[in-house]
Amino acid sequence: MIKEAILKVVNGNDLNAKEAYGAMDEIMSGESSEVQMSAYLTALSMKGETIEEITASTKAMRAHCVKLLNDEEVLEIVGTGGDGSNTFNISTTSSIVISAAGVPVAKHGNRSASSKCGAADVLEALGVNIYIEPEKSLKILKEINLCFLFAQNYHLAMKFVAGVRKELSIRTIFNILGPLTNPAGATMQVLGVYDESLVKPLCEVLKNVGVKSALSVYGQDGLDEISVSDKTSVCELRDGRLKCYEIAPEDFGMERCSKEDLVGGNPRENAEITLSILNGQKGPKRNAVVLNSAAALYVAGKADSIEDGVRLASEIIDSGRAKKQLEKFIEYTNS
């Protein structure tokens, strides 16, 4: 299947769903050679991945991952990475705030790929045990509305392509697939993307793979988050329909900051930033967490609008509930 797919893509032709699924299935099964994987991923990247190809590839990758057998609706807040901005861990910090509001959050992430500090790195620096079994993660999710799904524990088939990705050192479809393949089958999602051209297509993919409510976002300053230093392009999925619009920090009573105000550092430094926000420190970094948390609270139906979500997220931080949630998370993962 992958040989035929390579030939088709090299000639600039799009794959149908069956062809794209088959090619990814071969890769995830370890049946493709490194040369075949390199050719396929490079050609696909040069042609440009279609919605149909991304949807089918997502389904194939999901079929090969270890699943968290969860029967409740959960939310994911995640960025594709690759924006080169080296911000602190906005979505990871936000996941603590969101879950403290009573929204079940299955945060899916990995160690750093394109920045100094990934979700796994900062959580580990905060004292969270990231190496726990799926059964225990599910138990913790049910008890405190929060769990962390360390990608390498769930996407075991990625070992077949890891070497190729490292050697290629170019953006491939896998940069997009990670955030689309939550092992808990998240049905609510805030997805940050690294390129404005992906905002609507990836929202369409989320719809195709069963997500019910979502925001796909791109900060126009280049962030794969909702930005507080520029406008943000948004595509919203609600009731099976897509709606695209822009939002700005001023819409929510926030001052624009400079992009540099959101820069983080190594895991220890980013852990300190997260703690300072949860301890109530004001400023641009807190605003970024509040606004991204607000969007997720809106997606989850805990707030009637992003504006209402801003009020709720602020109250959760100021009341100390978010800090207590982190303390519980550390305790539960280490007990």
Swiss-Prot record:
Q: Which residues bind 5-phospho-alpha-D-ribose 1-diphosphate?
A: 79, 82-83, 87, 89-92, 107-115, 119
According to its UniProt record, which reaction does this protein catalyse? N-(5-phospho-beta-D-ribosyl)anthranilate + diphosphate = 5-phospho-alpha-D-ribose 1-diphosphate + anthranilate
Cellular-component GO terms for this entry: cytosol
Q: Does the keyword Magnesium apply?
A: yes
**What positions does the entry give for Mg(2+) 2 binding?**
D224, E225
Pathway membership: Amino-acid biosynthesis; L-tryptophan biosynthesis; L-tryptophan from chorismate: step 2/5
Enzyme Commission number(s): 2.4.2.18
Binding of anthranilate 1: at which residues? G79, N110
Q: Could you give a single Gene Ontology term from the biological process aspect?
A: L-tryptophan biosynthetic process
Binding residues for Mg(2+) 1, per the UniProt record?
S91, E225
Q: Keyword annotations for this protein?
A: Amino-acid biosynthesis, Aromatic amino acid biosynthesis, Glycosyltransferase, Magnesium, Metal-binding, Transferase, Tryptophan biosynthesis
A GO MF term: magnesium ion binding
Name the cofactor(s) required for activity, per the record.
Mg(2+)
Q: What is the role of this chain?
A: Catalyzes the transfer of the phosphoribosyl group of 5-phosphorylribose-1-pyrophosphate (PRPP) to anthranilate to yield N-(5'-phosphoribosyl)-anthranilate (PRA).
Put simply, this protein is called Anthranilate phosphoribosyltransferase
Taxonomic source organism: Methanobrevibacter smithii (strain ATCC 35061 / DSM 861 / OCM 144 / PS)
